[in-house]
């Protein structure tokens, strides 16, 4: 089941995210956020964009996806940066694709028109997921971050919804 996250999901989301921070280069954070910080992130995303969770058959949070501002400048307000994290053993089961699509649908219904995501290279799973959902490559920052003893490249992909005529309505 996919649903809107609440601050009560913070511990589960923090537990899912921690190995991405400590054991991989997928996240450029170096210290995993504690549940109280994750609760603040959830609340902030819910106020401005969206944060969804994927529950397994037992009702346990098995993944999450969220959108946030692409930039703080006003003319970017219809554009989002999006991210998804699943329990490491849950990848390639179809749940991630359904969760991410639900996030994109939620954000589109709220008036957002452009979705951007960055991924540390190489990351075949993320590249494949984004490609399957219609994202297109827009560029790569070379050696932009240093983690686990090496400089890392970050590729950016973008999904643009069809252009609207006239002035867009404000995202909500």
Give the predicted meaning of each segment:
Residues 1-13:
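A short beta-loop-alpha structural element at the N-terminal edge
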Residues 14-41:
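Conserved GNAT-fold acetyl-CoA-binding loop/helix
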Residues 32-89, 100-101, 160-162:
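Acetyl-CoA-dependent GNAT
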Residues 66-69, 116-119, 131, 136-153, ...:
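Conserved catalytic-core motifs of GNAT/GCN5-like acyltransferases
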Residues 91, 117-127:
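Conserved beta-strand-loop-alpha-helix junction that forms the acyl-donor binding cleft
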Residues 92-105, 128-132:
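Conserved acetyl-CoA-binding loop-helix of GNAT-fold acetyltransferases
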Residues 107-119:
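Conserved GNAT acetyl-CoA-binding A-motif
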Residues 163-172:
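Acidic/histidine-enriched, glycine/proline-rich intrinsically disordered or flexible terminal extensions
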């Amino acid at each position: 089941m996919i649903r809107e996250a609440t601050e009560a999901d913070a511990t589960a989301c923090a537990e899912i995210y921690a190995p991405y921070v400590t054991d991989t280069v997928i996240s450029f954070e170096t210290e995993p956020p504690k549940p109280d910080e994750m609760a603040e992130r959830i609340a902030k995303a819910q106020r401005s964009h969206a944060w969804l969770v994927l529950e397994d058959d037992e009702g346990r949070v098995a993944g999450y996806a969220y959108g946030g501002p692409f930039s703080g400048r006003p003319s970017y307000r219809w554009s989002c940066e999006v991210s998804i994290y699943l329990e490491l053993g849950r990848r390639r089961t179809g749940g991630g694709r359904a969760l991410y699509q639900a996030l994109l649908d939620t954000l589109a219904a709220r008036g957002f028109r452009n979705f951007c995501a960055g991924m540390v290279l190489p990351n075949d799973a993320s590249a494949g997921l984004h490609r399957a959902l219609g994202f297109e490559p827009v560029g790569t920052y070379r050696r932009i971050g240093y983690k686990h003893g090496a400089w890392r490249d970050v590729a950016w992909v973008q999904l643009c919804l069809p252009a609207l005529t006239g002035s867009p309505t404000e995202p909500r």
